[in-house]
């Protein structure tokens, strides 16, 4: 839907990031090091990046934090200020746990929430408490195979999709799907098998 605009907040990807990446690949080529074709084709990713954020869509080089202290930081409260009916996607490498309470407070503005939970074996209770507040309802889950599994063969990182039950009707029936779902879920790392999820009552 071209009427939907995307605003991305990411302090790790800027011009310096791309320059550093290209320099590293060029040096590897000059030294005749093995370089995968995908790495060589990364230059097209940069072109796609420029095109994607050319019209309407925005990339703001800011770090998402609980409380703003620096110019390059922004809180969820400020991100959602004057916003409504949004899809919020969060992948901030472990900092998601710091902002869960703010997300719950602003839940009425959010239609759909997609969030990647890192180190879930260390933060299980935080995730459980977030779910128990019932502001959002889980509609999908996928194990991220890039981070691997723990000793119980469970993923260390999961991607969860929530819907706002105040805005959409949801079924009370339990899902009978096997996860990952064929045709819907895709591997984060192609060379590794995807992680089959086990559920317990």
Identify the residue ranges that each predicted region occupies.
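Conserved acidic-Pro-Pro-aromatic motif
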Residues: 2-8, 17-21, 76-201
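SAM cofactor-binding core of SAM-dependent methyltransferases
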Residues: 1-70, 83, 117-119
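Secondary-structure junction/capping motif
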Residues: 70-76
